[in-house]
Each structure stands twice: as structure tokens, then as C-alpha cells.
């Protein structure tokens, strides 16, 4: 939904059509199965019924609601605003909060049965995992802090509760995610440019350093992975030649990072506001030399691996055959549009996000500074 607003700003989508589309999307989200206001992660696109044994996800709920918040502000439509408020209010963040080893944390998901996705480690109430690490969850804290049922002290304790390990590679230092996967640094910034927090950590600078470290690490393994040898970088989670894979780079927590040489183009799009020259050069290379990575209707494929598949022999000798993901996932299209637009100077999404009463309240409660 936030990406549709970028389309309006750039004159490629009709404002009234986007308003109607956003109304329909928010209405569909409201009808999805949920637990404590957390939406089911995967649902049948035609019926809205929960798909398989899908979990009820905090982060995917947050991403969807973030989009609704932006659309409500940009479209300035009373009905859309009303439905968005209902989604915001429905999320029972107080039920998601728990204490662990003296820290206030949010669970990651909820399941109905232990046989459900991620259900093996569920507690008696069905809660799974905890956001105890640095990852992509920053906007969840903003949404929770903006909820009137969450007292400010609890909201601030949640922000302070997750681990912030620091690591370096090639002179680039950042607070890092355990697996070193790049998308986690970019996703929160797509909705709002997180700057300096009350502890003095600049999250925008952190994302820049993580991006630079990822690039340096990938290039240091150019001898092993053809994708990196070609000048590509940006290891992250996504579709790979052998299925879904969570790739990463240093800094990471041992024994991470895992890597199979796959690069999601969305990582390079996400890095554009932080490293415009380096990310732009890699995207230009990808666009110019690998036309199969691009689709005129949906844009970049979800992943590229230049060293996957059977080798082929030609005039240049035996070389690996490139693999291009057949899928184009909307999640990656959205973040690519938001951060790509930000790299071109647009602040539409950021301004809209912080202007909504709920998110404005959350940002204020947490004492967060805006980077740009």
C-alpha cells in the first residue's frame, strides 16, 4: 500500500484508484484470521482463509499495518482512516509482551497447535519465539508504543530489551543481526528513517555500515562465488536455487554467516539510500548484463545466483550457468519501491508514517530521532 502511494507521487497511478484499492486491501486484512490482532502470515489469495499451518505473525502484521498507516495519511480518506484505526487498535500488544531473564520482550508469533509452522517450541498459550535480537522489528515497537493500552514504561522497556551485539568487517562497524542478513537493516527504514535512539545508537548510520560491511564481505569471497566475482553483493533471505535460504555476511554471530552465493536484487534496491554509488553500480551491472533478472511488468526477480545450475562450455571455456528466481514476491517489490524512491529524494512515505497519530505517539514515547 505504501508503494502505491509512491506511484501516485510519481504520477503513474491514479489517486482515486489507489484510495479504492487501499480500502479494499485494508478491508481484506481486517477479514483475515487473527489471534490477538496478529494476522495469519499466509492466506489463500482468493478466499482469505489461513493457508496450511501458517502462524500468526507479529512482523508481517506490522508490515501490513505500516502500509495501511501510510496509505491512510496520503489518501486522506475518512473511511480508509477509520478501517486503519481499527487494525491498529485490534493488535493486542499487551498480550504479546512477556518477561525473559529480566528483560521485557515481544513474542514473534502465535500458533494454534504445536504441529503448526514454528509451533514446535510454542508455550502453553501458543506463543512462539521472542524478539530478543537485533533484526527487522523496529517498527513493531513504534506500533506498540503508540497503542493506548501499552503504558510508556513498558513500551520503552521493549525497545531496550533486545540484544545489540557489535561487530566489524573491513573497517565497518555495526550492531548486527545474528545471521548477518542484509534485509533486516533496510526494512524498518523503508517506513521511517530511524535515527538516534535514547541510547545514542544511530540506526540509519548502522544500516549504512551494515550495507558497506556486506559489500566488502561479498567481494572478499569473489574467488568462491561467481555472483560476487561479477560485482554483485547483498546477501539476504530469499529464494535460492535450492529453495528458501537465509544468507548473510559479516558481522554475524558464529557459526554464521551462511552463504550459497545468491543475491536478491531487493537487497541492492534497499541499499540505495545508504550506498547509492555502490548499489547503483551493481544494479546497473545486473540490468545490463543479466536481462533475465528483469521483467518489464514486475521488475527484478527474487534472486540471482551466477554459480548455480549445470556448467556450460563455450568459447570462453567451462563456466557456471546462471540461475534466476522464477518468482517476483510482492514483499520485495514493496521495499524496493519505498527505498528506491527514498534514494531519489522522496520523503512521502516517511512523512506520512510519522504524521499518523498512532505512530507519532509511538515515536515520541520511545524518544526516537529522525535521521533525514
Can you say where each PLM-predicted feature lies in the sequence?
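Ser/Thr/Asn(+Pro)-rich, low-complexity disordered segments
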Residues: 1-372
